[in-house]
A protein has these predicted regions:
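Generic protein-terminus/edge-of-domain signal
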Residues: 1-64, 71-92
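Regular secondary-structure segments
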Residues: 43, 138-146
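Short amphipathic alpha-helical interaction/hinge segments
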Residues: 73, 77-79, 110, 167, ...
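Aromatic/histidine-rich interaction motifs
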Residues: 99-100, 104, 111-139
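Solvent-exposed residues in well-ordered beta-strands and their adjoining turns
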Residues: 44, 105-107
Length: 187
């Protein structure tokens, strides 16, 4: 088994979760610290990621975020935090921002050094055209989240796992590699 596969297999506990968030004109949602990994894919519109530490990041359609350490953050229609609502209380809107989100719980007592070495926020900007497999996984996951069918839970679990692998691969392909991430490229 390769290093990335082992890192994910050893840590995951529980059932992955994924959903769509279509948001109205003015909104700001708070994502509290989570004991796992979370992701956001902006399918359409524009938005802002406001991390707990660091500058706000503008998001455009096709941008993908990975929060490898479950760091608290906000998603908003503006670069400043307004009166934030917990994401659990989010209500659907008819605005242009449409997110595909997901998360799964990790056993932090068994953190693999590869995942521990990732930054708090991974932002793949400008679409993901350079990574067609990531595009395909996003398309499949979005279709599965939108439908209610037999086997949906099993499909969502598998697709969230695949999406995580492709997100980490894409980041490793685009960034200088040091430490444990570098080790996976060393035969």
């Amino acid at each position: 088994m390769d290093v990335l596969s082992a890192a994910i297999a050893v840590m995951r506990t529980g059932q992955p979760y994924s959903n769509r968030l279509q948001l109205g004109e003015q909104w700001c949602y708070r994502f509290d610290r989570y004991d796992g990994i979370g992701f956001h894919v902006l399918l359409s519109g524009t938005a802002w990621l406001i991390p707990e530490q660091g500058p706000s990041i503008r998001l455009d359609a096709g941008d993908v975020l990975l929060m490898p350490h479950g760091s608290p953050h906000h998603l908003s229609d503006s670069p400043q935090v307004m009166a934030a609502v917990p994401v659990e209380d989010a209500t659907a809107g008819d605005g242009p921002a449409d997110f595909l989100c997901g998360k799964y719980r990790l056993d932090r007592s068994r953190v693999h050094p590869l995942l521990a070495g990732l930054p708090d926020v991974i932002h793949l900007s400008g679409g993901v055209g350079a990574h067609p497999e990531l595009d395909a996984a996003i398309t499949l996951l979005a279709a599965e989240v939108d439908a209610t069918r037999q086997g949906q839970s099993a499909a969502l679990t598998a697709l969230v796992d695949v999406l995580l692998v492709y997100l980490v691969r894409a980041w490793l392909d685009e960034n200088p590699i040091t430490g444990w991430p570098k080790a996976i490229h060393d035969p």
